[in-house]
A protein has these predicted regions:
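Short acidic alpha-helix that forms the nucleotide-activated donor recognition element
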Residues: 19-23, 186
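Glycine-enriched alpha-helix->loop->beta-strand junction motifs that scaffold or abut catalytic
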Residues: 25-27
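Single conserved hydrophobic/aromatic residue that forms the stacking wall/gate
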Residues: 191-194, 198-199
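ALDH superfamily catalytic-core signature
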Residues: 29, 37-179, 187
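PLP-dependent aminotransferase-like
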Residues: 1-18
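Beta-loop-alpha module in the N-terminal Rossmann-like domain of NAD(P)-dependent dehydrogenases
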Residues: 13-20, 34-41
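Acyltransferase donor/substrate-recognition loop-hinge adjacent to the catalytic core
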Residues: 183
Length: 199
């Protein structure tokens, strides 16, 4: 058992919750995991009181697949690295850097694996992908898919086919040959998988 007071979970937004916590005189050190802008704000507040701060910022968790990879193992690892939590985790591998010599074979197998996913009620044992947390996030995902298609990005699996009226459901969505400079590469917390190639 954890003794009382050792672990306290306080939820809220940065300006209403995080800032008062960092400013509190009983807080002697700060650890922050999140976006770069949030980290800058936390560091600024902590520095005003000369509190040490440790940060893990940004990134969007790229996964890298080399030409000598076991394709089946890599496909399963990549799929399980993003889709089960709907990409709604800071450790979701939402970017895939894949060697150009294996991208076609890899993508074909990844699409097959993703098509076997069961999107639905997370309380059902057969479900492998639950809903998006809220409407704003759900609509952002749909907008990103629409925008990417209009810009001509190669959509190889469209998760919008899983959309329904009784919740914020969307299936795995995969874009292939996406440049690292596009907004899809760092897109936050979604079912979107953006494939980039390297040589």
């Amino acid at each position: 058992d954890i003794p009382p007071g050792v672990l306290n979970v306080v939820t809220g937004y940065g300006h209403t919750t995080g800032e008062p916590l960092i400013n509190h005189p009983d807080v002697r050190m700060v650890s922050f995991t999140g976006g770069t802008n949030g980290g800058k704000a936390a560091a600024k507040i902590a520095s005003q009181q000369v509190k040490p701060i440790v940060m893990e910022l940004g990134g969007k968790s790229p996964q890298i697949v080399l030409p000598d990879a076991d394709i089946n193992l890599a496909v399963n690892g990549v799929a399980s690295g993003i889709f089960p939590a709907g990409g709604q985790s800071c450790i979701s591998g939402s970017r895939l850097l894949i060697h150009s010599s294996i991208i076609d074979k890899f993508t074909e197998q990844l699409v097959k694996v993703c098509k076997r996913a069961t999107v639905g009620d997370p309380l059902q044992e057969s479900t492998t992908i639950g809903p998006i947390a809220n409407r704003v996030h759900y609509e952002r995902i749909l907008d990103n898919i629409d925008k990417a298609q209009k810009e001509g990005h190669n959509l190889v699996l469209d998760g919008r086919n899983e959309c329904r009226d009784n919740g914020f459901y969307i299936g795995p969505t995969i874009f292939k040959d996406v440049p690292n400079t596009t907004y899809l590469a760092p897109v936050s917390y979604t079912h979107l998988r953006a494939h980039e190639t390297f040589h």
